[in-house]
């Protein structure tokens, strides 16, 4: 047995990876220079830093789709992240791409998500817009807070007591571009964007079926016939398609048929699950909770932990957004209750006659 150090790993990349893959030796680097690790190439170090950071642990108690589900088997933001990482690594390995970069990007892509899922994200944007005097329904107002930008902000300056994780440029680019119209500069980042869509479309259907909100027969017939009749079949079909089409194209792509089938399922979920129905009944409460927390804290900065006040002095809305977006669902409820629910007085009963 022998030790394979960082230089050995980098040499292996040159032999094993595709010519289009990102190589650790060619990274654009970090914002702050630092000594290289003896064993780990740069992207593996990034993956490990994300895995060990506080924001990653908090994902275990943040909503994916269902607010405060009672069952043990519904996805959270953490399980979603792990599923994205698994799908992305499978694609990256099949295409000869850099698995460390792919996994680091996947593990970090949702670090900046708010409590209560996308409704929390919308509520925070709405509250920030009102604070700034911007129409909350305008394009600017609707997107003041975006979880992908917040994920980058976390790893650049909020984690590690304000020092950030000092990740490589490629990982930060992939995190920023995993959603929206802007494509990542690396193929590995583009793989994560595809894996994210595959994961949430397939597992949100799975969770909805488990909750009794949907059945397989409710799904559009075309995608079922093309992709399969179960979550695992659909994931397998889309992963195989991406690998085959991308290998031929030299870029990360799906075939038109599979892409349209996936987007048809996504549209179905928006129409039947994300924007209405039993799964969304609690969203108005969660929205109001986030807005009330923001409105209170933005005028009571003394109640915001010091670590969130180290940046953007003079911009209390940003400081409060940093704090609130980092809360888990349970912690947000607890802070809200502390602000709004009277506490019991232990000595009260002793004075009753």
Q: Model-predicted segments: where are they?
A:
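Histidine-centered, transition-metal-coordinating active-site segments
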Residues: 1-77, 81, 85-91, 98-99, ...
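Short alpha-helical catalytic segment bearing the HExxH-like zincin motif
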Residues: 102-107, 193
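Membrane-interfacial alpha-helical segments at the cytosolic side of multi-pass membrane proteins
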Residues: 119-125
